[in-house]
Every structure is written in structure tokens, then in C-alpha cells.
């Protein structure tokens, strides 16, 4: 086997000269001292085998101490004529697993002669038989600034991190550096684990306010607010369609508080629906007020007087506060054209706090002349309120004269539109004008 590998050995029966033997001992010690600085700590206590194989036994060398390498001993000059047939065994690079985890070496490759010992000086560059670390060797030399490709630190490029990932776990590799004596530090600098800023931002640097800040920001978006308002209106419309009685409870509330000067549902419901439609939320209640004029007012002045008197009567009696906003409705008849009479409703809103007072009128409903004449004939000439109107209302005359007609809502029979709808239309216009007069609310 030795001959096949190209190593020529001295025959066992031929002992080496004494001078060569003496020179081989220090050169072998120097070779072992240099080699021990690149070997594993496991080889510190191993026994060495003499480099020459012959029949005469040689004394074993003392164990090599890796803590402090011995001083360099000058080697004897090599013979001028090299020995023919002497060859240096090729160095074989062990795998990383063998270089780090293999068993301790039991022997070194035998040197063929003293010349072989002389040729085994430490190499000028990094060893190729295995990766080792020294205190004076720069591992970045020869890489032109690139990261060194070593078995200890393989180069790789991590894929881009996407999404929010948990904080990385730093693993500390417990590897024993080769040939490190006491107090010797390795020249390798391992890269530190750096946290991804996106991870820390997603976990620690949460926006101020948390989930409530997010909800507040979304709710303040005009587009989101518009969608929510439309959705709310659709739900309320569905509920009020299925159960009309739920409308006052759904839209009741807010800062707007209004009192209607009547306890009749036809007036209170119409005003409530109109103001809640314009303001969104409004509290609207009804209180019966006295007009202190004739039951059937005649003319615009009488109608306006009756509406205002209802508000004043509630304030005088203490039913409502002096600063309370009130809405009053009063119907009257008027001859707009010769022998052409119409029924009209007068609506008044009064807000003493803001100094607002507005009037509006419903659409005019034609009333046949004969029914107006009957109401005039039923009113005594000495009636004390004759200056303001008639004692008998037009509704009472129509209820007695026509079938299926009521005094409170005869408008539906004549026009197909109920009195409540007429009051609602005028009240909505009144609420719109009132909203424009109000000062803007602070945000």
C-alpha cells in the first residue's frame, strides 16, 4: 500500500546515520509544535510515533502542550543534493464533519528522511487540509472584500420576510475553537441577530389609542360616515314601515326639544316627522293650548293670531318654559278670489333663546262656497269673537252634509291628500328655515 501511494520507505534492516537521526529529532519537534497549533485540543495528550519505521525501537517524544508553542528552532541546512525518489505525501482535505467531530489522530504521516522533515515547514497561507483559526491569521485575506466561505459560517441569502412574524430566537452555537489556548480569542466575528423593524413595529409600536383610535379614525372618515348614515336610514325606514309606531322611539333624542301647541295627533305627528327628518333626532311633544279666538278663523291675520296665541297661553300658564322652543298650527279660511274660498294652515316656530320666529303656510285647499255660507249662517250676529271668525267650523258643516267625511280630515275627501300630509310638508319647510337660522354647532 505504501508503494502504491508513492511513498518510498527505508528498508527495516538499514538503520539511519546518527547525524541524520539527531537532526530529525528537533525538526520533528518543530513540525509537531507547528502542527499542534492547528490541531484539535483532543490531540494534546496523544503519543507520537517516530517518523522512521525501522527495527530499532525509538523513545517516544514527550506530550505536546498546546498552551504555549515552543520557540522556533533553526533547522540545519538541507543537503545540497536532494534525495532522489523522495516524495511528499499529498495532503488530503478532510470534510468539515471530519475536521471538527472526528476522533483524535493516532499518528502522523511518517517522514521518509531528514529531507522530508525539512520540507514540512508551516505553510505561508491558510491550511487546506481543514479549517482552523489562529490569532494572527486574517480570514478575509484573499477574498477581495467578500464574505469568507468557511465551514463555520456558510453564506446564504434569506428570503424576504413578509407579514408579521414572531421575534427570532437567537441560537448560540457552542463550538470549541481549534487550538485555542487559555486567554486566546478567536478572530472570527459572528454576525449579530438584528430584529426586523417591521416586526417590532407591528408588535411594540402600535398606534396611540389602540383599537379605539382606529375606530375613531374610521368613524371620522366622510365616506364611511356617509355609508353609515345611509345604512342607518335604510334600517330605520324598514323598521318604521313594518311598525310605524316605532318611529317616535327611534328618532327621539338629541339636543332639539320642541313643544307643539296641540294634543291632536294629526298636528303633533306631522310636526314630529318633519323636524326629525330635517334634524335627525328631535324630541317633539304636544301640549294643548288655547287660541282665544273664534273656532273657525277667517283671514291670514286671524290665522296667525290664533297660532301665536296658543304659544303665549302655554307660556302664561307655565306649562312650558319661557325659553322653550314651540311650534303652533292653526287652520283658517280665506277668500283669495271673488267667491273662492280656501282652507289654509298657518305654522309658527318661536325660539326665544336664539331670537328666531318664522312662519309657514300649508297648501290651499278649495272649499265649496255653499259650505262656507252655511257656516256663516250658523254663527250669531252678536257673537263676541265675530271679528276673528265663525262660531261653526267648515269641517263640522261638511261632516253633517257629506257621508264618510270627518270634521278633522275632510281634506282627504276633497283632494286625495290628508291634512297630516299637508301639515308635514309645511312643517318640513319650516324646519329647514329654522335649521339655517341656528348658529353652527361646535365640533
Curated annotation (Swiss-Prot):
InterPro entries: ITPase-like_fam, NTPase/PRRC1, PRRC1. Residues 1-108, 139-206 are annotated as: Disordered. One of its GO terms (biological process) is epithelial structure maintenance. One of its GO terms (molecular function) is protein kinase A regulatory subunit binding. SUPFAM superfamilies: ITPase-like. Residues 59-80 have a biased composition (Pro residues). Residues 34-46, 169-188 have a biased composition (Polar residues). One of its GO terms (cellular component) is Golgi apparatus. Interacts with PRKAR1A; resulting in PKA activation. May act as a regulator of the protein kinase A (PKA) during embryonic development. This is Protein PRRC1. It comes from Rattus norvegicus (Rat). The lineage of its organism: Eukaryota, Metazoa, Chordata, Craniata, Vertebrata.
Amino acid at each position: 500500500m505504501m508503494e502504491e501511494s508513492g511513498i518510498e520507505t527505508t528498508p527495516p534492516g538499514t538503520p539511519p546515520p546518527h547525524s541524520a537521526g539527531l537532526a530529525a529529532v528537533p525538526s520533528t519537534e518543530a513540525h509537531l509544535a507547528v502542527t499542534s497549533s492547528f490541531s484539535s485540543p483532543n490531540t494534546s495528550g496523544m503519543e507520537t510515533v517516530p517518523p522512521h519505521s525501522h527495527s530499532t525501537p525509538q523513545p517516544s517524544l514527550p506530550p505536546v502542550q498546546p498552551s504555549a508553542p515552543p520557540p522556533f528552532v533553526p533547522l540545519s541546512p538541507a543537503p545540497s543534493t536532494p534525495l532522489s525518489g523522495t516524495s511528499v505525501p499529498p495532503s488530503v482535505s478532510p470534510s468539515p464533519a471530519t475536521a471538527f467531530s472526528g476522533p483524535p489522530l493516532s499518528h502522523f504521516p511518517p517522514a521518509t528522511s531528514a529531507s522530508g522533515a525539512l520540507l514540512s515547514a508551516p505553510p505561508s497561507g491558510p491550511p487546506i487540509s481543514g479549517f482552523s483559526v489562529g490569532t494572527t491569521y486574517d480570514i478575509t485575506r484573499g477574498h477581495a472584500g467578500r464574505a469568507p466561505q468557511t465551514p463555520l459560517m456558510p453564506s446564504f441569502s434569506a428570503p424576504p420576510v413578509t407579514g408579521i412574524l414572531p421575534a427570532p430566537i437567537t441560537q448560540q452555537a457552542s463550538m470549541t475553537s481549534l487550538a485555542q489556548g487559555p486567554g486566546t480569542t478567536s478572530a472570527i466575528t459572528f454576525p449579530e441577530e438584528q430584529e426586523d423593524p417591521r416586526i417590532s413595529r407591528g408588535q411594540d409600536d402600535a398606534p396611540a389609542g389602540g383599537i379605539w383610535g382606529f375606530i375613531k379614525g374610521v368613524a371620522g372618515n366622510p365616506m364611511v360616515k356617509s355609508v353609515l348614515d345611509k345604512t342607518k336610514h335604510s334600517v330605520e325606514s324598514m323598521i318604521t314601515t313594518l311598525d310605524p309606531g316605532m318611529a317616535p322611539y327611534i328618532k327621539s333624542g338629541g339636543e332639539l326639544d320642541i313643544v307643539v301647541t296641540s294634543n291632536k295627533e294629526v298636528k303633533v305627528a306631522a310636526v314630529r316627522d318633519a323636524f326629525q327628518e330635517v334634524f335627525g333626532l328631535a324630541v317633539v311633544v304636544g301640549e294643548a293650548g288655547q287660541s282665544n279666538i273664534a273656532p273657525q278663523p277667517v283671514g291670514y291675520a286671524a290665522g296667525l293670531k290664533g297660532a301665536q296665541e296658543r304659544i303665549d297661553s302655554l307660556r302664561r300658564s307655565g306649562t312650558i318654559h319661557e325659553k322653550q322652543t314651540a311650534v303652533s298650527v292653526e287652520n283658517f279660511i280665506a277668500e283669495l278670489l271673488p267667491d273662492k274660498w280656501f282652507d289654509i294652515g298657518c305654522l309658527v316656530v318661536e325660539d326665544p333663546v336664539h331670537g328666531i320666529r318664522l312662519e309657514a303656510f300649508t297648501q290651499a285647499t278649495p272649499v265649496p262656497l255653499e259650505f262656507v255660507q252655511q257656516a256663516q249662517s250658523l254663527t250669531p250676529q252678536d257673537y263676541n269673537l265675530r271679528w276673528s271668525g265663525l262660531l261653526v267650523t267648515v269641517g263640522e258643516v261638511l261632516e253633517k252634509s257629506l257621508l264618510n267625511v270627518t270634521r278633522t280630515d275632510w281634506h282627504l275627501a276633497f283632494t286625495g291628500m290628508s291634512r297630516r300630509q299637508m301639515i308635514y310638508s309645511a312643517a318640513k319647510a319650516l324646519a329647514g328655515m329654522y335649521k339655517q337660522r341656528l348658529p353652527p354647532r361646535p365640533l
